[in-house]
Amino acid sequence: MIDENEFKDVADGIHDESTEIKPYQTLLFGLKGDKVESTYGACEGTIASDVDYITQCMQKVVESKRQLFHLVPVRTNLEIRPNTLSFRASKLGECFLKCVQMDLDRVTDKYPTLGKYNPYFGMFHQAVTCEVEFVNGVALFNTVAREEWLRFRDRDFWPDETLALFVDCLNEAVEQIRREGNSNAFRDWKKAFERQPNENQQTLWSLILACLNVNHHLSILRFDLGYAQYYCDPDLSGALAITYDKVRRHRAALRRFLKQELKKRLRPGACKGMGFAIKGEYGLDKTYHFHVIVILNGDVVGEDISVTETICDQWRDTITNGKGGAYNCNKASYRERGIGSIRYSDEKLRILRTKVVPYVTKPDFYIGMVKPEKHRSFWPSHPPKIEASRRGRRRGKSESWGIVDSSAQAK
């Protein structure tokens, strides 16, 4: 227990600790008549948004050092209130309390093994679902805290002894999460979890550089592919529901289209020095989906939006027979745009390297829940062959070194 002035000093000292939780935003596809349309934006109150919030919060808790919860003495009228202590939480502590208020049973009922694939959720679930002996008997801590304490605006209405028990349980849960999150076993898991995405990132960037060696002017197409929510839920769509085997066939058909058919629909030379990469992911809200990059000859392809739409139409109408949805990123507006027309010396090439490529190849907690261990989730094309004779002015060393340096710094 600390006094009010000491708590203010502690609170002032934790402003340097990161407490920002990014709002959960997602891309979903829904049926509208006989068409599949996309919507992108904030999506609160879902299982996916709750798990995302818990994950971000636990990442910050693992990195934090200070105590998050305290009791401070206050002057009260004991005839009106049964206590002389008041509950205080730091900013990160408030984020932790929001996690405690979430319905974890809703998550684990639908995804019983979620904690295995997302250890941040697993460590939180284990830490707050411990049994605690209260006055009326033994109960799960998170259940009592959520249903009988945090649901009320006044957190101090309990007797001092009960408030002290809540604070002790919360701080012990935080310490348990910190111990696990900073253990050698967890660090080994994290290193292994990030290894393949890091390799995929380097593979994709090397592919882009190889395409730049063939064409000094690129047209970068970016689009996301998925399925209408109706077909993602077997309870709604029954035998029409999307399965892992169907997704594999759709991905193979997309790859064949990009390798063999796309060039037949574009102007001659558009696919000279072409490259592409497909990344498969699984979301708790939208289930199976893909992030795709296609690299074309920028001197020939001027309308990147329409070419991207051609591929998206093929996915929607032919490959998935109307079950699939597509989002044309080239049509959207971005504050930092690393797609579309890109030349070797463009600032957009840096954005492509530092923003677009890492996003496409980012780690995915949940793909392991639905695919066999030996199956891949990233499919890059082979790099284009570099011709012995190259046209155009000779690139200076400073230009070449600039790209190599930025690549090395991003590792």
Task: Describe these PLM feature segments.
Residues M1-C169:
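Extended repeat-based interaction scaffolds and adjacent low-complexity, acidic/S/T/P-biased segments
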Residues N136-N213:
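Long, contiguous juxta-domain segments that are non-catalytic but functionally important
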Residues A228-C232, I295-V300:
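A short, flexible beta-alpha/helix-coil linker loop
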Residues S206-I278:
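Signature for HUH/AEP ssDNA processing cores
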Residues G275-D299:
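Histidine-centered divalent-metal-coordination microenvironment in nucleic-acid enzymes
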